[in-house]
Structures are given as structure tokens and as C-alpha cells.
From Swiss-Prot:
The keyword Repeat is annotated on this UniProt entry: no
Gene name of the encoded protein: pedA
Function: Bactericidal activity (effective inhibitor of L.monocytogenes).
Cellular localization per UniProt: Secreted
Protein known as: Bacteriocin pediocin PA-1
Residues making up the propeptide: 1-18
GO biological process terms on file: defense response to bacterium; killing of cells of another organism
């Protein structure tokens, strides 16, 4: 179970975040980083699905 706390707008303004693209890639304001374990899993799973379905599946976010 997760503990969730509601933040005020002032508290939200102090949070510096980035964007997670769902495939192991996360980008912030000035740079991006890759979780290679997650990225490798996505590449293998998407490749297998694309092969098994003749290219109709396999481009989903992991």
C-alpha cells in the first residue's frame, strides 16, 4: 500500500521532475538517462511481439 499525501500548489512548485517515456528513458530539464535493464526488456518483448504478429504489435510502452 502506498502512502499518499496531498500537496499544496506552493509545495508542487518546488518539485523538479522530468518525464518518463515508459521504455526505460527518463528526461529532465537538461538531460536524459536510460535504465538499460528496462530498455533491454522492452526491446526484447516488443521485438518478440512484432515477430509473432507479423509486425502488427510490439510498439507499446513497457
Amino acid at each position: 500500500m502506498k502512502k499518499i499525501e496531498k500537496l499544496t500548489e506552493k509545495e508542487m512548485a518546488n518539485i523538479i521532475g522530468g518525464k518518463y517515456y515508459g521504455n526505460g528513458v527518463t528526461c529532465g530539464k537538461h538531460s536524459c538517462s536510460v535504465d538499460w535493464g528496462k530498455a533491454t526488456t522492452c526491446i526484447i518483448n516488443n521485438g518478440a511481439m512484432a515477430w509473432a504478429t507479423g509486425g502488427h504489435q510490439g510498439n507499446h510502452k513497457c
